């Protein structure tokens, strides 16, 4: 069984207000994407990495991230699509998976603080079950709202905030994405596509520091998290 990390990094980062895409912004002198890839590069149970980025940025990604930082597990840099879901399908089609039971970890390129232990647990669960979704319990009260009016308050104990990685056996996630593409269905995450197949996705406890860096405020948090991580080493 091979374990492959599929890392979508094709977002335009409009909310960041920067001149370059968010995945290439520097965090202590190193692109965010490089911090993320380093986690998979150092994880002994991960065999391969595929990065998905806008087609025009493939040469930049190869030179300034993959080659500059010496990521030996990166097998390919794949052109992304219009939506994240299209990008992931492109990545799945590019993976050299000879066995449908090979495991694929799908992880956002701008989530550099995922603990290795969470990755390992995700692989274990995905191997035994239909899939593994990393998530954390909601801390805040959640409201449903229509036209500016509160319409309900879901029980907080049932609300979990989805993160990545979302991890599946290759045959399951490939089938889910191909079906969604054929039917023109656009989901909010990879797990939702697997759920449409009638499969049961199991939750793996995540980490509240596993943030998706999309705004300037997130960058401030990320800098603080990185200093904390460095001080613990």
UniProtKB/Swiss-Prot annotation:
PROSITE patterns, per the entry: ISPD
SUPFAM superfamilies membership: Nucleotide-diphospho-sugar transferases
Q: Which of UniProt's keywords are assigned here?
A: Isoprene biosynthesis, Nucleotidyltransferase, Transferase
GO biological processes: isopentenyl diphosphate biosynthetic process, methylerythritol 4-phosphate pathway
Query: InterPro entries in the record, alphabetically?
Result: IspD, IspD/TarI, IspD/TarI_cytidylyltransf_bact, ISPD_synthase_CS, Nucleotide-diphossugar_trans
EC assignment: the record states 2.7.7.60
> Which reactions fall under this protein's catalytic activity?
2-C-methyl-D-erythritol 4-phosphate + CTP + H(+) = 4-CDP-2-C-methyl-D-erythritol + diphosphate
Which residues are annotated as site, described as Positions MEP for the nucleophilic attack?
A: 156, 212
Q: In which pathway does it act?
A: Isoprenoid biosynthesis; isopentenyl diphosphate biosynthesis via DXP pathway; isopentenyl diphosphate from 1-deoxy-D-xylulose 5-phosphate: step 2/6
Q: HAMAP family per the record?
A: IspD
**What function does the entry list?**
Catalyzes the formation of 4-diphosphocytidyl-2-C-methyl-D-erythritol from CTP and 2-C-methyl-D-erythritol 4-phosphate (MEP).
Q: What is this protein called?
A: 2-C-methyl-D-erythritol 4-phosphate cytidylyltransferase
Q: Which gene encodes it?
A: ispD
């Amino acid at each position: 069984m091979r374990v492959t990390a599929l890392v979508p990094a094709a977002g335009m980062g409009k909310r960041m207000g920067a001149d370059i895409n968010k995945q290439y912004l520097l965090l202590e002198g190193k692109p965010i994407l490089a911090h993320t890839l380093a986690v998979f590069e150092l994880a002994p149970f991960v065999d391969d990495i595929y990065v998905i980025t806008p087609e025009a940025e493939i040469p930049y990604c190869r030179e300034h991230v993959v080659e500059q930082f010496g990521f030996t597990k990166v097998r390919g840099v794949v052109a992304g699509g219009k939506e994240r879901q299209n990008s992931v399908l492109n990545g799945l089609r590019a993976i050299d998976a000879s066995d449908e039971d090979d495991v694929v970890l799908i992880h956002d390129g701008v989530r550099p603080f995922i603990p290795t232990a969470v990755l390992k647990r995700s692989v274990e669960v995905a191997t035994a079950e239909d899939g593994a979704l990393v998530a954390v319990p909601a801390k805040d009260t959640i409201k449903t709202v229509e036209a500016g009016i509160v319409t309900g308050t879901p029980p907080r104990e049932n609300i979990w905030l989805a993160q990545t990685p979302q991890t599946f056996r290759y045959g399951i996630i490939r089938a889910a994405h191909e079906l969604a593409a054929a039917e023109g269905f656009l989901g909010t995450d990879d797990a939702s596509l697997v759920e449409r197949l009638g499969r049961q996705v199991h939750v793996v406890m995540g980490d509240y520091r596993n943030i998706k860096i999309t705004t300037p405020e997130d960058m401030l948090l990320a800098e603080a998290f990185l200093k904390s991580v460095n001080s613990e080493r």
